[in-house]
Regions:
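Asp-based, Mg2+/Mn2+-dependent phosphohydrolase catalytic module
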Residues: 2-52, 59-64, 68-87, 91-135, ...
Length: 189
């Protein structure tokens, strides 16, 4: 995945432009779970807001799995002053509303990621600049590209286990970081 990110970097540099997300302070990282991200590290990087994906990042698409320790991690981050915003491309509006209310996080649905409009709207509602916001999601083609286009840093988490869609069977290994097969959700961390 880092190789694909560097290809986009090289492409923009060949055009003589540098996308806003490639500034010194911005970064791209891959982790297994949401809870494995250190809140203190984000704060040291100047992060004050998190744009969070819902489907297969926080909750599996079929609602069977919740990211291990995800709710606790969000509550801890909120107590430390970090703002959250959910952007979801999911088709089930009531599901997005349910999780938005349960986690007490505002949401935009449908976000039409990777287009940057919803990312900019979320940043405006949090009253933060792109260098103060990080995008956390599981999909390269929506979350990582959306972060790149909107000028934000990004952390890609492993996709929670879910029934694969037809296109994921064909392209999944290029757009998602798979959840480790040798690990169970409750064994992580």
């Amino acid at each position: 995945m880092l190789k694909i990110f560097s290809i986009f970097t090289t492409y923009f540099q060949s055009l003589g432009r540098r996308p806003r997300s490639l500034k010194k302070n911005n970064f791209f990282q891959q982790v297994i779970t949401l809870a494995s991200i250190e809140i203190e590290t984000l704060q040291l990087a100047g992060i004050k807001g998190i744009i969070l994906d819902l489907d297969n990042t926080l909750v599996s698409e079929d609602d069977r799995y919740l990211s291990p320790h995800g709710e606790t991690w969000i509550e801890t981050a909120k107590l430390q002053g970090i703002q959250f915003f959910i952007l979801s491309n999911g088709k089930r509006k009531h599901r997005v509303i349910y999780w938005s209310n349960r986690l007490d996080i505002p949401a935009i649905h449908p976000a039409k990621k990777p287009w940057p409009f919803a990312f900019h709207k979320a940043m405006a509602r949090m009253q933060l600049k792109a260098n103060q916001v990080i995008v956390i999601g599981d999909s390269f083609h929506t979350d990582v590209m959306g972060a790149l286009l909107s000028g934000c840093s990004c952390i890609q988490v492993a996709t929670l286990p879910h029934p694969p869609r037809w296109w994921e069977k064909l392209f999944g290994r290029w757009v998602h970081k798979p959840y480790p097969r040798d690990r169970e959700l409750w064994d992580v961390d």
